[in-house]
């Protein structure tokens, strides 16, 4: 069922949540060398997906032990199974495809990693997402410690596909952009419920769109392309609240 949340209703529903800790970490950690080596071997066809998973499992098991050892009250898998903090989750949504890009929206100094982006190809939905199994493994090895799962915010999908991309052309279903915002929100409703049903009680939505919308240079560039960031930002608030 679709839940219609207006700003007033959201404010009425806000509750004060007291987490069982006074400090927290983002949740992404540097990959150990042996995991980076395994990823390279997988990319080159030297090992298969099951062999890579076994290495990931080992690295995550070791990381969780360290997190608990230093006193973290909520542990993560370090995002060790991901190539990117955001694209992996979004690309595994129904109706979304990862494609090559000429460059990232943020230019790195020194080494330039291969760029990628996303394209909306069909109705966006959430079904049988691999991140659910990722969480279940983490929850199992944590043995009762609170587990935090991190996923990109709903706004990141729209930002990447529709705002950053100068070549964006909506598919027939999304010529009315309200339908796009709605489908993204409903997909996230399903995702949040699925993680909850899997035992997740700490789901963090990571979002860099707001910082980008505050950047003077970015705002100028988007305005020159005819984009109204203030209007888009309001739509993001409504979409996240609906999600």
Can you say where each PLM-predicted feature lies in the sequence?
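Domain-level signal for soluble alpha/beta catalytic cores
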Residues: 9-243
């Amino acid at each position: 069922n679709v839940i219609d949340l207006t700003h007033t209703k959201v404010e009425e529903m806000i509750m004060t949540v007291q987490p069982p800790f006074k400090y927290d970490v983002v949740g992404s950690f540097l990959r150990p060398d042996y995991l980076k080596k395994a990823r390279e071997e997988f990319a080159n066809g030297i090992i298969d997906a099951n062999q890579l998973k076994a290495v990931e499992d080992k690295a995550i098991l070791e990381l969780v032990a360290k997190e608990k050892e230093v006193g973290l009250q909520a542990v993560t898998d370090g995002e060790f199974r991901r190539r990117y903090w955001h694209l992996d989750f979004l690309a595994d949504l129904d109706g979304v495809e990862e494609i090559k890009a000429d460059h990232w929206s943020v230019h790195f100094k020194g080494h330039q990693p291969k760029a990628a982006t996303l394209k909306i190809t069909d109705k966006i939905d959430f079904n049988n997402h691999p991140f659910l199994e990722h969480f279940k493994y983490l929850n199992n090895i944590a043995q009762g410690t609170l587990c935090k799962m991190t996923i990109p915010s709903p706004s990141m999908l729209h930002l990447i596909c529709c705002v950053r991309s100068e070549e964006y052309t909506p598919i027939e279903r999304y010529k009315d952009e309200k339908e796009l915002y709605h489908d993204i929100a409903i997909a996230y409703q399903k995702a949040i419920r699925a993680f909850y049903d899997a035992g997740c009680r700490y789901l963090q939505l990571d979002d860099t769109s707001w910082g980008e919308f505050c950047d003077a240079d970015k705002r100028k560039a988007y305005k020159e392309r005819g984009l109204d960031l203030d209007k888009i930002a309001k739509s993001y608030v409504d979409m996240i609240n609906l999600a």
